Amino acid sequence: MAPGWAGVGAAVRARLALALALASVLSGPPAVACPTKCTCSAASVDCHGLGLRAVPRGIPRNAERLDLDRNNITRITKMDFAGLKNLRVLHLEDNQVSVIERGAFQDLKQLERLRLNKNKLQVLPELLFQSTPKLTRLDLSENQIQGIPRKAFRGITDVKNLQLDNNHISCIEDGAFRALRDLEILTLNNNNISRILVTSFNHMPKIRTLRLHSNHLYCDCHLAWLSDWLRQRRTVGQFTLCMAPVHLRGFNVADVQKKEYVCPAPHSEPPSCNANSISCPSPCTCSNNIVDCRGKGLMEIPANLPEGIVEIRLEQNSIKAIPAGAFTQYKKLKRIDISKNQISDIAPDAFQGLKSLTSLVLYGNKITEIVKGLFDGLVSLQLLLLNANKINCLRVNTFQDLQNLNLLSLYDNKLQTISKGLFAPLQSIQTLHLAQNPFVCDCHLKWLADYLQDNPIETSGARCSSPRRLANKRISQIKSKKFRCSGSEDYRSRFSSECFMDLVCPEKCRCEGTIVDCSNQKLVRIPSHLPEYVTDLRLNDNEVSVLEATGIFKKLPNLRKINLSNNKIKEVREGAFDGAASVQELMLTGNQLETVHGRVFRGLSGLKTLMLRSNLIGCVSNDTFAGLSSVRLLSLYDNRITTITPGAFTTLVSLSTINLLSNPFNCNCHLAWLGKWLRKRRIVSGNPRCQKPFFLKEIPIQDVAIQDFTCDGNEESSCQLSPRCPEQCTCMETVVRCSNKGLRALPRGMPKDVTELYLEGNHLTAVPRELSALRHLTLIDLSNNSISMLTNYTFSNMSHLSTLILSYNRLRCIPVHAFNGLRSLRVLTLHGNDISSVPEGSFNDLTSLSHLALGTNPLHCDCSLRWLSEWVKAGYKEPGIARCSSPEPMADRLLLTTPTHRFQCKGPVDINIVAKCNACLSSPCKNNGTCTQDPVELYRCACPYSYKGKDCTVPINTCIQNPCQHGGTCHLSDSHKDGFSCSCPLGFEGQRCEINPDDCEDNDCENNATCVDGINNYVCICPPNYTGELCDEVIDHCVPELNLCQHEAKCIPLDKGFSCECVPGYSGKLCETDNDDCVAHKCRHGAQCVDTINGYTCTCPQGFSGPFCEHPPPMVLLQTSPCDQYECQNGAQCIVVQQEPTCRCPPGFAGPRCEKLITVNFVGKDSYVELASAKVRPQANISLQVATDKDNGILLYKGDNDPLALELYQGHVRLVYDSLSSPPTTVYSVETVNDGQFHSVELVTLNQTLNLVVDKGTPKSLGKLQKQPAVGINSPLYLGGIPTSTGLSALRQGTDRPLGGFHGCIHEVRINNELQDFKALPPQSLGVSPGCKSCTVCKHGLCRSVEKDSVVCECRPGWTGPLCDQEARDPCLGHRCHHGKCVATGTSYMCKCAEGYGGDLCDNKNDSANACSAFKCHHGQCHISDQGEPYCLCQPGFSGEHCQQENPCLGQVVREVIRRQKGYASCATASKVPIMECRGGCGPQCCQPTRSKRRKYVFQCTDGSSFVEEVERHLECGCLACS
């Protein structure tokens, strides 16, 4: 559904619900209330996708369907569904539910369908569904359930569909399914089940679907029954495979012979399990009824703990709240430690029922208040530590049940006072800590000093913080008479026993007694924190313009008088005075109010005086003062009232005085009633007078005769409603449509109560500011405009907005506060803009958002956009359409599915991206122009003198800018279009002297020398062996002055240069390298090798002798060090460890002497390793470990009659087996391996099956093959790539076959568990190096090996140089194409001529250019051939020289791949499908298919799955009536 229609649908549903509610009022009892934010229709309650954290209250008792899916509910309590006796369908899927209290469903007697999938349930409580006998469908899939207790499903005997797949189930207790006799569908796939008891499925006679695949079944003698059971029911339990023992791994359970199901012991008992024993939370440890979760990084209290625990330790975590009933079910708890967390919220019943609890430790948290009743019932508690929190008050009955408490610590909190009697219940208290609290030692704390003097139990030294006279003095040592109250202190702390400490006087205000005076302080809003004791609030003479509905008066029960005179109030929001029932006097004199109505004064039920003097009120209507029945004095003096409608004062039943003076009354027929009313009531102050018509001017209204109140030519009334729909728009109820009207601003006359506004397809360049006044809007469509920028708080007043459509505009930047205030927004569409980045925090206020459209935006996915990736993944609010555009490694990746760690910042961000939020950063203003941001034009330039234009690039005097290049002279000229002409120096030409003619076109360079163009000349670059200005002289490199051979080497002249014949001991092209003969020396006993020319000598340690120091001195041990006789290979270093020699291997080598090379790194483009062939037995496997960050490549390849390939494809491992006698078979791994870490890959061949196992996960099988795949003697194995000469000739190629080699590391290759040694690399294995490190020398290109230890770089387009670090020069710069376009061809260019021109430089005009003017093409277009002749290119369905003949209706067969989208996976047919297209003429009829048939095709998907679908194919075409 499109976002725009979603809003319409919501409006229709809302109106339908309203109509149903009205019908209910007229025809029966009053409608039942609906929970806040939910939608109720008939017996259905829809609360899905609202971000709810708990089940809402107030669900109608008659509800039959309840949708609570896609919220954030974490716990289901006993009271959540109490009383819902008619409920039949309950949806709770896709929440965060981890705990369901026993008895949560006890009232749901009629429940038939319950969905709890996609939650976080770990344990299923027994007897949970005992009270839901009519349940027929139960979905518990995609949770974290670990075990199924015996009584889990007791009571639901009618259930037909039970889904338990995709959990962590490893234990199913005996009898768990015994009562489910009507069960038809049971899903247990994708769990951890290893054993199933023989009685599990015996009581399911109606079972027709059973899924057991993707488990860990152990096929021993105890599972033999399942094989028989499945063989008798071939349609159920398909693909159920054995995972152990090893010799049965991958076999179908039903296909294994009974004799193979054996146990080690002949009479072993079937293993049993206990579902409750596995309920210890995964990060914790459980032993001796103690649960230890210390320092595990927990964010919440673990659920489903072992029921018999006596102690739980949760300190040093990140827990923020203790939910309701968190520990209630653990009745044996004695000790709870939750110290050093982040707890700020504790439910009142968190510790309810813990009568055995003796120790409760809560120190080091962020607790600000102890809720009422938190410690009630903890009669055994002896230790309570509340220190190091932020507790600011304690109710007098907080500790009422703690008679046995010995130690109480309130040290280091925010307590200012303590209520008298707080410690009275603590009969056993021995130690009390109160220090480090900011105590206010006034009259209310006098009792504490007396208490501590009588009971010296406070040992921490509690002191006063204020007042100053008592600051820093010990409370227990201060005399009672010094504790006294003064000023407003008594009001502030009077109710401290109820945890109420009144607020201090607001900033900028003055408080005296109960008067709060905030007048004349330039305030723009009412202070948000006012003391509760205030009775007189003075806010006059400020700058308040709008009275917001903040609920401030609900907190002021003592308020009697409000003075808001002399402000700038233009609007009073509905509900602004809610809770102000005690207010008796309201002054609004001297403001700018134009209209008022009864809803404005809602809440002022006790108001007696209302002053509205000196405002701009023009009309008093029937509802202006509705609800003000207590008002006695009303002043409307000095307004602009011209009309008062009859009955305007009827609701003012207590009115005794009204002032209507100084108003311009229009005494026409609309005011005739007022004169009679004034004469009758006699409560008016003064005599209000007429101002219109002229003949009644200044006459008192009550004196005007009734016949003089006429409307002849004077029907004006200020109370008449203005038109409710703008001219350019159409309106229906509260929906206004102004689409495609060419609007550049919001039209005037927009109804204030509009709920849906459609402004798409106009020319708006910014979001109209006037929209902020339309507070009832629920949908705004601003798509297909020209809006280029949003501002902060653009939509902050639109609290009801649920749909905002900004697609297909020119948005480049999203300010961080642009969407602030949109807490009701559910759909936000930003599709099709130019947004590259979204600042973190932009969506903080979008708490109700369920759909975000960000597609077709050039997102720059670096580390600054990582938060958005995490946010999108957490809530699945973006449907997987938004793609990254940059940086290059992230291009075309999906925002939803790309791993978060790939969002990285590397190097500076392109200035064009940064400048989207500040266009001035790209320095668009030239010639020292000053740049300023502009919300419409993006930027504006203030140009210096002599320049003009948008970017200050146009000179007022064209020659000031020196447009002539290369020293040309500028001349002002009116005859040229640019206003100037250039006189060029010798060697340059062109309008601006920008062209350097190519002097090499006619050069005299000889011997294939390269000509380099200069300025009016050229230079010849000679090849080797030639010199001279024209390279016409041969060089003799062996003459003494040119001989480059070093170290007495012999120079030998060659045809193309020379070579050096080195003397022994030297090497290199010029014999420049002195060979180090010590590289392979044989010096022993630690002797030092000294290199000499063509040899070396050994410098022996003292006492040793011989050429190689091989003779030890007499009378000494031959071995002075264990390493002396221990030779490490491959350059390894020998070290002594515990008196034993040990080799420290270089990267990639292993073995006792580092003799084996087990890790190699593939860095070249065509790198590979060839392994010697070995016959693989019928039971064999190949395993290896890989590490890479690339998406594609060849891991392993076997080429013979049965080609086999193990490939890296889009980050997954793909196994392809291509027997030439059958279609190729492919299987994909679920796991991705391109994260740079090592992953294990195993290929198992067993009994004509081929299985792929990645990271020891679930095997992926190719199924039963026609014959056993094997690696023959003559079929080599290639790792990391294949020889370029071999290609993939033996393996049939598909469109997605990765032809490139593998880039990364391969480690520990084993064939039949035999570790392979890479040490003797074949000579063709180029670009393969020991160890694991990547080739990084090529800056902008790929490595390609040329020698064993050498690589060359293949550069990406636009880069050149040996290391691809030089930006390539565009060969088209300075091109000489006259009438054509320059096209680069490598380092040169060619000219693509315009029509009518030819030649190498497009400088020859063809005479046939206008030949098409006389050559008519009836159904096609005329073109000129290469020979200059005209010809017709016909439209489809026509032929002939002039396209005059209509082709008959025929079918043309094309072959192409058919594609389908399946979720987030893209699927395509395995081969191209022949498709017939009908083309040709049929006169008045149409060329259409006349016969077709359907055929099944196999579709393969990118996620590794496949499916079969029927596709319709056309067979014949003919002429039929057009449909």
Swiss-Prot record:
Q: Which InterPro entries match?
A: ConA-like_dom_sf, Cys-rich_flank_reg_C, Cys_knot_C, EGF-like_Ca-bd_dom, EGF-like_CS, EGF-like_dom, EGF-type_Asp/Asn_hydroxyl_site, EGF_Ca-bd_CS
GO MF, one example: Roundabout binding
Recorded name of the encoding gene? SLIT3
Q: In which tissues is it expressed?
A: Predominantly expressed in thyroid.
- Name this protein carries in UniProt: Slit homolog 3 protein
All copies of the LRRCT domain together span 215-265, 437-487, 663-713, 857-907
Where are glycans found on this sequence? 72, 192, 563, 622, 784, 792, 797, 928, 1008, 1025, 1181, 1247, 1406
Ranges for the LRR repeats: 62-83, 86-107, 110-131, 134-155, 158-179, 182-203, 308-329, 332-353, 356-377, 380-401, 404-425, 533-554, 558-579, 582-603, 606-627, 630-651, 753-775, 776-797, 800-821, 824-845
Matching entries from SUPFAM superfamilies are given as: Concanavalin A-like lectins/glucanases, EGF/Laminin, Growth factor receptor domain, L domain-like
Q: Where in the cell is it found?
A: Secreted
